[in-house]
Amino acid sequence: METSGEDGSAINHSELFSQLVNKDGQMNDTVASFLYYMFPRELFIRALSLIESCNMFIYVLVPSGVNDKNNQPLKFLEVSDLVNSIYDDSELHRLIVKPSDEDVPTYVDLNNWMCSCQEYTDLMLERLNQMEAGSLASSLLKDIDDSQRFQEDRFAQLDAHSLSMQRYVHCEKLNCPHLLAYSILLRSSTRTLQHFLEKGQILLIQINNMDEWLKLHINVVE
């Protein structure tokens, strides 16, 4: 998270992501071009292709309850409520990319900036091999402990709920299409996520049963 503008100020990736799709549902070509040149290895194009592939799943755990009046299960949350719960971190959610039944699914964890894909693993190993002194954390992380310098950017941010410190991953050192694609969806604005949901390119699935939730994790591990 070292990217800076011409005046030396930090770029707010979340703000850029939120402007990628305008209010008319059209791609903002100016913002898209800027993001294309911002990320190496054609990461932005690969992330957009991933979003358009219809292979990205967002699972949300909403524990089932019972309506005391008629003893009936509570209804599923509306899509807008699910989207808000993801942005508020009020419900557990899991991000999984699964191209086909034969392919191994890719597990993505934005909160801890981790991905199970080979590209992410290779970059992590490369950083480990390049280290001469110090720790991996000092090489990959940037801490901001001065509240006057706190940023609104949520992209590649860890410990997002801390009141005393902001911690970011140096995304120019450790990034992959899966992390970037989900960041565009979940570290921008609810309107951006709603746009791709309405186009049917992102699958948002509510899970009410804890057993099904645990099976989901087991399947990813397998």
From Swiss-Prot:
UniProt KW keywords: DNA damage, DNA recombination, DNA repair, Nucleus
Main location group: nucleus
Residues spanning the signal sequence: none
Subcellular location field: Nucleus
GO annotations of cellular component type: nucleus
Tagged with keyword Nucleus: yes
Disulfide pairings: none
Highest taxon of source: Eukaryota
GO BP annotations listed: DNA recombination; DNA repair
Family in the record: Belongs to the SHU2 family.
Function, as annotated: Plays a role in a RAD51/RAD54-dependent homologous recombination repair (HRR) pathway to repair MMS-induced lesions during S-phase. Required for error-free repair of spontaneous and induced DNA lesions to protect the genome from mutation.
Protein name stated in the entry: Suppressor of hydroxyurea sensitivity protein 2
Record organism: Zygosaccharomyces rouxii (strain ATCC 2623 / CBS 732 / NBRC 1130 / NCYC 568 / NRRL Y-229)
High-level lineage: Eukaryota, Fungi, Dikarya, Ascomycota, Saccharomycotina
